[in-house]
Amino acid sequence: MGKEKFDRSKPHVNVGTIGHVDHGKTTLTAAISAVLSKAQGKAATKFDQIDGAPEERERGITIATAHIEYETDKRHYAHVDCPGHADYVKNMITGAAQMDGAILVVSATDGPMPQTREHILLSRQVGVPYIVVFMNKVDMVDDEELLELVEMEIRELLSEYDFPGDDLPVIKGSALGALNGEAQWEEKVMELMNAVDEYIPEPVRDTEKDFMMPVEDVFSITGRGTVATGRVERGVLRVNDEIEIVGLTEETKKTVCTGVEMFRKLLDYAEAGDNIGALLRGVSRDDIERGQVLAKPGSITPHSKFKASIYVLSKEEGGRHTPFFANYRPQFYFRTTDVTGIVHLPEGTEMVMPGDNIELTIELISTIAIEDGTRFSIREGGRTVGAGSVTEIIE
């Protein structure tokens, strides 16, 4: 049986769940799938399928990013269930970068917790433009005043990070109740999805720009060749287009895309916002790796030295407790990978304090596909300590 074609008649939007560990992100993801599938007479994606990343089994925490799809009457959604645990902020960064909007899940029994704040901050850094709130586990709280208090706390926290805390939708429900088929909670999931439909605008896709896709994963299909997966950041990729593999190596490699698929369906082309697998001609599994980008030939080049405007997280935001000096060597997280780099401070600046905003020069130990405006995080030992944006390429 051949693969069925992907239906493009509905607008396509990328969303995802964020929030503190055990507040119910994965349960809500499964509940949305269950409630919408029931309404449309389709098969739902089960909790175990979403939670079923291989690493999962040992620790009962979601590590790998799960991608599922579902539809409302108005839209087709691709949903990433972002890992909630602090150890896996790395995945949060790759996950959150894939969202046109996020559903922030906060348990009514706990209220906002440290990772709630961290995920809101990361959403602000990686450019998640809209957040809708789902207050979960409200069936476990009898006190109406307490619910109002938690809602107020969430709204204030969002406002603190420049999201419109007073205006964005907050839906109160029970993900588990909805997943178990209880009508009153199923209704709340429908209400949530109506809010997502209405509040998260249809994204302005970057289809007019030159094609680029950060490589998230690579695997080989026997007899067909090498497939690179990722989310198309901009432009359009058509079957038989020539593309370049850029970054991490000195010279860029040219190849031809011989096939495009999304959600196991074949496409004639992929466009900005699509999560795809691109089949590459004449490329071996070792010629390409996570952290590189696929791009229209000549449109983006690899660089290792640039000026950037950075914000260094304060101690309160989970950043460093002490200043850093010249020759500081953290990791710089670009799109899907960490690269070590050396920081050169501007003349007359001896040190940079947590909470500072400064322009400085960064020299990476390997090249990355970058251009003005490319965003990145600064990390040490897996912990985000800053965020930045490229302002000028030097070499």
Swiss-Prot record:
Region: G5, residue numbers? 174-176
Q: Which GO terms describe its molecular function?
A: GTP binding; GTPase activity; translation elongation factor activity
> Taxonomically, which superkingdom?
Bacteria
Catalytic activity, as annotated: GTP + H2O = GDP + phosphate + H(+)
Where do the record's region annotations for G3 lie? Answer: 81-84
Fetch the InterPro entries from UniProt: EF-Tu_GTP-bd (IPR041709), EF-Tu_GTPase (IPR050055), EFTu-like_2 (IPR004161), EFTU_2 (IPR033720), G_TR_CS (IPR031157), P-loop_NTPase (IPR027417), Small_GTP-bd (IPR005225), T_Tr_GTP-bd_dom (IPR000795)
Q: Where is the signal peptide?
A: none
Q: Which residues bind GTP?
A: 19-26, 81-85, 136-139
Q: What is its main location?
A: cytoplasm
Cited PROSITE patterns: G_TR_1, G_TR_2
Q: Which UniProt keywords apply?
A: Cytoplasm, Elongation factor, GTP-binding, Hydrolase, Magnesium, Metal-binding, Nucleotide-binding, Protein biosynthesis
Per the record's keyword annotation, is Magnesium included, yes or no?
Answer: yes
Span list, region G4: 136-139
Q: What is its EC number?
A: 3.6.5.3
- List localization entries: Cytoplasm
Q: How does it assemble?
A: Monomer.
> What does the record give as the function of this protein?
GTP hydrolase that promotes the GTP-dependent binding of aminoacyl-tRNA to the A-site of ribosomes during protein biosynthesis.
Task: State the name under which the record lists this protein.
Answer: Elongation factor Tu
Q: What organism is this sequence from?
A: Exiguobacterium sp. (strain ATCC BAA-1283 / AT1b)
